[in-house]
A protein has these predicted regions:
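Classical eukaryotic N-terminal signal peptides for Sec-dependent ER targeting/secretion
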Residues: 1-2
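Exposed, interaction-prone regions of secreted/extracellular proteins
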Residues: 6-137
Length: 137
């Protein structure tokens, strides 16, 4: 694990991420689907600035350029609460776009999100799906 971590830190595409992981398909075929489930954590002690937490995963080309498609769970993006939304950062021109759909979520909510590859038009569709959004009491 340490070797992977050192390699990952050495190739940090943004020179600022705390950590990240990379995977390359041994067959060279594109990743067709990525899914994750997460539980919204408690509100942070400090809510803004560099202390505001955010979590995401993303899909991009094997060259590490072009569009980085990513569902994001972030605190403080729209106010003093958590939101989940989709975003796209384009490494080629530095542009940043977010989806018009942004959902407010609460600590304890269980969320799922996914990114699906569409072979027909060589695109990806992210979903910050709230279909499993529930709260444990």
């Amino acid at each position: 694990m340490l070797g992977l971590l050192l390699t990952s830190l050495a190739n940090d595409p943004a020179n600022s991420w705390l950590s990240y992981a990379a995977w390359t398909s041994p067959s060279g075929k594109p990743i067709s689907f990525v899914n994750t489930s997460w539980v919204v954590p408690n509100d942070p002690a400090q809510s803004y600035g560099s202390n505001a937490p955010g979590w995401w995963y993303g899909i991009q080309t094997s060259n590490g350029d072009g569009a980085l498609i990513q569902p994001i769970l972030a605190y403080g993006y729209q106010g003093s609460f958590y939101s989940i939304f989709n975003a796209c950062f384009d490494w080629t021109d530095g542009s940043w776009h977010t989806s018009p759909e942004k959902y407010t979520v609460q600590p304890g909510d269980k969320l799922t999100s996914s990114v699906t590859y569409n072979k027909g038009d060589n695109s990806c569709t992210p979903q910050p799906a709230l279909k499993t959004r529930t709260r444990d009491c």
